[in-house]
Curated annotation (Swiss-Prot):
Catalytic residues of the enzyme: H151 (proton acceptor), D398 (proton acceptor)
A Pfam family annotated for this UniProt entry: Transferase
Protein known as: Putrescine hydroxycinnamoyltransferase
Classification of source organism: Eukaryota, Viridiplantae, Streptophyta, Embryophyta, Tracheophyta
Enzyme class: transferase
InterPro entries named among the record's database cross-references: CAT-like_dom_sf, Plant_Fungal_Acyltransferase
This enzyme's EC code(s): 2.3.1.-
Length: 452
């Protein structure tokens, strides 16, 4: 697929004529911003013709950036490259226009592959903008929208809110129900308790002690840092392919019934699907030692747990870590894996989040030279990580021509890093994007749709 870039420009925030231009402001990063993945994430939408005009999309982008100013600012780093915050300087978002001489249906892949990297701005090198957008028009009139954002500025919950608001602005509607900008972090938002109460261990969970760092670099504004993306460029990394497993609503219902048999309250859709994929991956990987442990890293949203203000824009995620042995995963029924997942997520409760705030505010991180464990790797085996987008309103992005015909993550070939996404069919089915080694793919397919 040959993509021809037509233009690249900055789109700066626009403000109502009656409003005074806001002043430049520095927003310090919260402990949740600093502990998450410091990288660029990318997603891709496709819209059927007749699609919205570029002018309407650009106008909507300028309007929504005027409300979500964090996405129009620039990341600020310290002398060692550490994240300090975002300066709200109205630098703007990068907008790239491109075209493809062919039909979207004939050319664009249905699952992440190196080809889709051409449908969004590059994630390599220094990136001065928090947000980048690429609008790729196909000869058939279809439009692909590639969106990238710095994960250290906002999590998936916040980003999905931004995208829905962008669509509203492009249609000439109010960005949100209220005129006020969404709340973001400020120094008094996540205060430690007095006295602090660190009830749980956070060393070896959210933080680890790295080897001595190399010589630091000067602080800077803008630009990416460290382990940014992990998508492997145009060539597959280590023979890893991304398989798209489509679970129908009926299959999920039967899976939940099997997992929840004899249980008063059935396991959730997420718990059931993840338990099934965990067991399937364990089998496909050919892990032979029954005593070997496998762990999943699961994102847990802390907005309700910490009673964050409505519409909070930033990162507010920690992780649950269910663990089981290979022998238990393969030798015990599906309900065992689902229960392990359920219990681990339940332990990441309000008390755990408050303990983390107290620990992160105690000075131990700086004093002991601790670093976040949220660092991308090429291979996770025997472990897994899951990003669940099942409850985010990504499909509500509508620029005026209707909702997208498909939506998926970009190409991130980290073996074992799963994405769970509602199917574009809108019928309750779920798509799981599963990076596996090529030599394990057939084994995964053979047991993926088996209900034991």
């Amino acid at each position: 697929m040959e993509v021809k870039v037509l233009s690249s420009r900055l789109v700066r925030p626009s403000y109502p004529a009656s409003a005074a231009a806001p002043e430049e402001e520095f927003v310090p990063s919260s402990m949740f911003d600093k502990v998450t993945y410091d990288m660029q994430m990318a997603i891709i939408y496709a819209f059927r013709p007749p699609g919205p005009s570029v002018a309407d999309i650009e106008k909507g982008l300028a309007a929504v950036l005027g409300v979500y100013r964090l996405f129009a600012g620039q990341v600020v780093r310290g002398g060692g490259g550490e994240l300090r915050g975002v300066v709200l300087n109205d630098h703007g978002a990068r907008l790239v226009e491109a075209c493809v001489d062919g039909s979207l249906a004939d050319i664009a892949p249905a699952k992440p592959s190196p080809v889709v990297l051409r449908l969004h701005p590059s994630l390599e090198g220094e990136i001065e903008e928090v947000v980048q957008v690429q609008l790729t028009r196909f000869a058939c009139g279809s439009l692909a929208v590639g969106f990238t954002a710095n994960h250290a500025v906002a999590d998936g919950h916040a980003t999905s809110d931004f995208l829905v608001a962008w669509g509203r602005a492009a249609r000439g509607l109010a960005v949100a129900a209220t005129a006020a900008a969404p709340p973001h972090h400020h120094p008094g938002m996540f205060r430690p308790r007095d006295p602090p109460l660190v009830e749980f261990e956070h060393r070896g969970v959210e933080y680890y002690r790295p080897p001595p760092p190399a010589a630091g670099v000067d602080g800077d504004v803008g630009g990416d840092h460290k382990q940014q993306h992990g998508h492997g460029g145009e060539e597959a990394s280590h023979g890893i392919v991304i398989h798209k497993a489509h679970f129908t609503k009926d299959f999920i219902a039967r899976l939940r019934a099997a997992a929840s048999e004899g249980r008063g309250r059935p396991f959730s859709r997420f718990e059931t699907i993840l338990a099934h994929v965990w067991r399937t991956m364990t089998r496909a990987r050919g892990l032979g030692n029954p005593l070997q442990s496998s762990t999943i890293r699961i994102s847990v949203d802390g907005r309700q747990r910490l009673s964050a203000p409505a519409g909070y824009f930033g990162n507010l995620v920690l992780w649950a870590f269910p663990r089981a042995t290979v022998g238990d995963l393969l030798g015990r029924p599906l309900k065992h894996a689902a229960q392990v997942i359920h219990d681990a997520v339940a332990r990441a409760d309000a008390a755990y989040f408050r303990s983390f705030v107290d620990f992160a505010s105690s000075g131990a991180v700086e004093g002991e030279g601790l670093a976040p464990t949220a660092v991308l790797k090429d291979v996770l085996c025997p472990d897994l990580e899951v990003d669940s987008w099942l409850t985010f309103p990504f499909y509500e992005l509508d620029f005026g021509g209707g909702c997208p015909t498909y939506f998926m993550p970009s190409y991130f070939p980290t073996e074992g890093m799963l994405f769970l996404v509602p199917s574009y069919l809108g019928d309750g089915s779920v798509d799981a994007f599963v990076p596996v080694f090529d030599h394990n793919l057939e084994a995964f397919k053979q047991s993926c749709y088996s209900i034991e």
